[in-house]
Design a protein with these regions (language model features):
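Loop-helix junctions at membrane interfaces
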Residues: 1-172
Length: 172
């Protein structure tokens, strides 16, 4: 499972400071760091499908770790518009949009991984029978949505009070 924290924050800062590609690269690097701290995958032999028996653990790592953190860097699509406005209100809107966009993409990766790899876990925990997608949506939302809100709020504080964090040194 996931946890509530600030894991998206460095990716968001780099995505706004440097743009889309550096944000994506930073997300990929964060994914590697997260995996160095330990990974949890379902044993492929527990699947009925022979493809998932072989490729399941790899696909789960790709969705739950590599892609989940890498896509947060897509917040960088708002970097140029953020930097090109003088309005504090618009800057706040752009960091909220980017934080939500990157965070929701991460959430989608976790929901897809959960729907595919955690079959029938809902009945074990919450009585949600035979609907791994609903279980995954609820379970992952319980920590992804607070993460989006927390990181978005910190980014708003940065945009309002510490905006130099979100601009490269070569921009005055």
């Amino acid at each position: 499972g996931g946890s509530i924290g600030f894991g998206m924050l460095p990716i968001l800062v780099i995505a706004y400071r440097r743009g889309l590609l550096p944000g994506i690269i930073c997300g990929f690097i964060v994914s590697i760091i997260q995996m160095l701290g330990g990974i949890y995958v379902i044993n492929g032999s527990s699947f009925d499908n022979s493809f998932l028996q072989v490729m399941g653990p790899f696909l789960q790592i790709m969705l739950d770790y590599v892609l989940a953190y890498t896509v947060v860097g897509f917040a960088g699509v708002f970097s140029k518009t953020f930097k090109n406005t003088d309005s504090k209100g618009k800057k706040v809107c752009y960091v909220i949009l980017g934080s939500a966009f990157g965070g929701l993409l991460k959430y989608a990766c976790h929901v897809i991984a959960g729907g595919v790899f955690w079959l029938n876990q809902g009945s074990s925990f919450w009585g949600i029978n035979d609907d791994s997608w609903l279980y995954s949506f609820i379970y992952n939302g319980a920590y992804c949505i607070p993460n989006i809100i927390i990181c978005g709020a910190v980014m708003v504080i940065f945009a309002l009070y510490y905006d130099k964090l979100l601009f490269p040194n070569d921009i005055s």
